[in-house]
Structures are given as C-alpha cells and as structure tokens.
C-alpha cells in the first residue's frame, strides 16, 4: 500500500522513470524557443553526448524524493500589449518562459497522469484526448442539428467558457479532486510540491521584478495545466449531474446535453427552460470550486423544425 511521510514524500512510489522515456521527451521539445530563468537553451542538450543520462539522473532523483530544483519551479512572465491602450492590465497577454529541463520532466509526468485521467473523463470531453479535437466537436454539433431536423425536434444551444479559468483554480480543491479521481498519491505529491514552491518574476522593458510566490491557479505556460483543468471541469460536470439529467437532445437512444473542449462547453436541450436548468446547475457547481462562467462570451440560440 502507498504510504506518505509527514513531509509529503512517498515511501513506496510509482515505477521508476526509464531512460528511454527521458530521451523521448527530450526529442519532443521544440527548438528555437526562448530559454527559461536558467538561461539553458534546448539545443544544448542535443549536442551533449551524455545529456540524456544526466537528465535521467536528475528526473529520477525528483521522482524518488518528490522535490523539485528551484529553477524548475520558477517562471518568467513577459507581458505583451494587445491594444494601443496599454494602461489596462486586461489589454495584455502574457508569454511565460520556463526551464526546458523542467518541461522534460513535466512531459514524463503528463504521460503517467494520462493513464489515470483518460478513464475518468466523459466521452463528451475532447480536449487533450488522443485522436480527438475541436473538429470532432464541430462535426458532432452538425450531426446533432441534422438529426434534430430529421426527427422534427427543437434544439437550443448555449456556448460557455470560464472567465480566466486557469487563474482561478483553487489548489486545495484541485488536490481533493485528484484524490477523488483516483490519481495515485505519488503523482499528486509531485504536483503538490511543484505548486508549493512555485515562483515567478515579471520582465518588462523597464527591468525585472523580484521573485514572488503564486498561491492560486493552474501554472501558466505548463503543459500539465490543461490536463489538470480537464479533471477540474470533469468534477464540476459530475456534481452538476449532467449525465443523469433528463434535459438534453434525445437522439438514437441517447440523451446528449453537453460537448466539451477543456474549458469550453456547449450545453444543449430541446427547450429554453431545460437549457436554463442545465446552465444554472453548471453555474452553481462552478462557483463552488471558484470558477465563474463568463457572460461576456456566452452565446445561445435555438432552432425549430
């Protein structure tokens, strides 16, 4: 049985990382990208003969101790103005620079997480699912519309997403969700320790700020963030009871009331009243875990035969 010490270190961890997994992860890192806070370009690892061996040793040490190097916990935020009016923070988008070496470890951790996450995610979630994407969901919506017309059914849609979804992820709730979803303690401990030591600095043309801690949100710029948010969103939809709800579009013996791509959700029903009922359930459960549906971007429309 898995045990955890009072310091949060796993006594009996998951199977060790293999060197071939490190080599594979390194090969997927994109070149010609800006370096993180450590200043090490990814191209350096491609010319060093023993790079894979050294990286494997470091990753294995992290795997065994669940403790991350400080440079791997740090991010550099670079704000880029989207509009001419650069007086408002909302008019900026942020580029996040992280260590390329940390990305290697994160890719390995992501692969392990996916093994446990995929069975937990509903079929209607297409985000970060192998062989699936936004095109599939668009095709599904078109198919549903065609079938609704064929069977002379009304159909109402509501397209929703969350206001700054990743920024408002509550860490304590996230760890609770990981446990409820059956994520092994070893992997959850690695994530908790990574987030506990998270630091960032903001770099502008005027200089760089001091390092500061971040206590909320899924880590910006990290490949794991969409995966973790998938579980966060799945928890919301389960508690909203969408799978058991009577509201939806009943086609081919199945009731369909939502399609998802990470934080983007399309709700659907045969009447405006049913659609509103679904929306209120999702809204209530979202607010319980700190997320708010964005009404600025929400769109809805109905089709009648």
Which residue stretches match the model-derived regions?
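Hydrophobic (often cysteine-bearing) scaffold residues that line and stabilize catalytic clefts
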Residues: 18, 37, 41-44, 48-51, ...
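Conserved pre-motif C helix in the palm subdomain of viral-like polymerases
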Residues: 90-121, 166, 215-244
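Surface-exposed loop/turn segments and immediately adjacent short secondary-structure elements
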Residues: 1-90, 96, 100-104, 121
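Catalytic palm subdomain of template-directed nucleic-acid polymerases
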Residues: 165-181, 217, 259-289, 303-305
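Short helix-interrupting loop/turn segments at helix-coil junctions
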Residues: 1, 32-37, 65-71, 86-88, ...
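Short, conserved micro-motifs composed of acidic
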Residues: 12, 206, 293-305
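Conserved catalytic palm subdomain of right-hand nucleotidyl-transferase polymerases, strongest
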Residues: 32-40, 77, 87-97, 135-179
